[in-house]
Regions:
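Conserved ABC ATPase "signature" region
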Residues: 99, 103-106, 111-129
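Conserved ABC ATPase signature
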Residues: 133-137
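Conserved ABC transporter NBD signature motif
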Residues: 59-70, 74-75
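A short, proline-enriched helix->beta-strand linker immediately N-terminal to the Walker B motif
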Residues: 152-156
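Short, charged/small-residue-rich alpha-helical element at the C-terminal edge
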Residues: 229-300
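ABC transporter nucleotide-binding domain
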Residues: 176-260
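Catalytic Walker B motif of ABC-type/P-loop ATPase nucleotide-binding domains
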Residues: 158-161
Length: 300
């Protein structure tokens, strides 16, 4: 099957500065894929290149098999982008904005388009704002309109560039519920976010960028297991026996932390503590965390 997004040996230079250093990746149709990295890693440059807004210095980019340069109309038609910045035309209502956006892709006005716009407005809780001027909306409402704009031409591939930056919890939950529906319906989702828990919960595969390069790329589960460990936290009444000091990784008050690779090690560690004379009053197991993985990868 043709990849939804294909990036082959992409480089982008601004004079002596290298923004993208030979990036290659392939995202399958129907994937929910995260692209993570610190500010300046090259994520937005890569997205701009996919959208045809930035010409790369070398390499090829394709969306649903369409080259973003030689077949740019088809590539752009297959792509819907929710930008990081809130950009809007202050002279039009929400409904007018969506109609104009659809027109840019050659979609004629009519019952079919209006029905789809009404469905988008309902899904994004914008129905009561449909005829309001864009400048009258709150920041969160404007961001919902950006999502609707990205979807109004029904693209199979959707790019979300920091879609929940600066929005409240209610909007975040509403947006992710809708995006999950889109992914379940077969849409390919490419997400960039600094909320790593979102990427961990939503995405099946993750790539991490640093200084214009991909420094890690794998399934979410494999990344969590490769770069992070479960932690057994044990609360002990009294001092930790000296024989257990050297295997403890950290102490927080009365809680002692021990790294474990899998759950089968829990009873082994507890038995060793009891045998050494430790009086255990409480315990918990912390699962691997994407934030820890991210920090470990960036510090390598």
């Amino acid at each position: 099957m043709t990849p939804a997004i294909e990036v082959v040996g992409v480089e982008k230079r601004y004079g002596q500065f290298i923004a993208l250093a030979g990036i290659s990746l392939s995202i399958a149709q129907g994937e929910f894929f995260a692209l993570l990295g610190p500010n300046g890693a090259g994520k937005t440059t890569l997205i701009s290149a996919l959208a045809g807004l930035t010409r790369v210095s070398a390499g090829k980019l394709r969306v649903m098999g369409h080259d973003v340069v030689s077949d740019y109309r088809a590539a752009r038609r297959a792509l819907g982008i929710v930008p990081q910045e809130i950009v809007f035309d202050p002279f039009f209502s929400v409904r007018e904005t969506l109609r104009f956006q659809a027109g840019y892709f050659g979609i004629a006005r009519g019952v079919a388009l209006d029905s789809w716009i009404d469905e988008l407005l309902a899904k994004l809780s914008l129905t009561d704002k449909a005829d309001q001027n864009m400048r009258q909306l709150s920041g969160g409402m404007k961001r919902r309109v950006l999502v609707a704009q990205a979807l109004v031409h029904r693209p199979p591939v959707i790019v979300l560039d920091e879609p929940t930056a600066g929005v409240d919890v209610e909007l975040r939950q509403t947006l992710w519920a809708f995006v999950r529906e889109l992914n379940a319906a077969g849409h390919t989702i490419l997400l960039t976010t600094h909320y790593l828990e979102e990427a961990q919960q939503l995405c099946s595969r993750i790539a991490m960028m640093k200084l214009g390069k991909i420094v890690a790329m794998d399934t979410t589960d494999h990344l969590l297991n490769a770069f992070s460990e479960r932690v057994l936290r044990v609360k002990i009444n009294g001092e930790l026996p000296p024989s257990q000091m050297q295997v403890r990784t950290r102490q927080t008050g009365a809680w002692h932390h021990f790294a474990i690779h899998d759950l089968s090690e829990v009873e082994t560690r507890l038995a060793a503590l009891r045998e050494a004379g430790a009086h255990i009053t409480n315990l918990e197991v912390a699962e691997p965390d994407l934030e820890e993985v991210f920090v470990n990868v960036m510090n390598k």
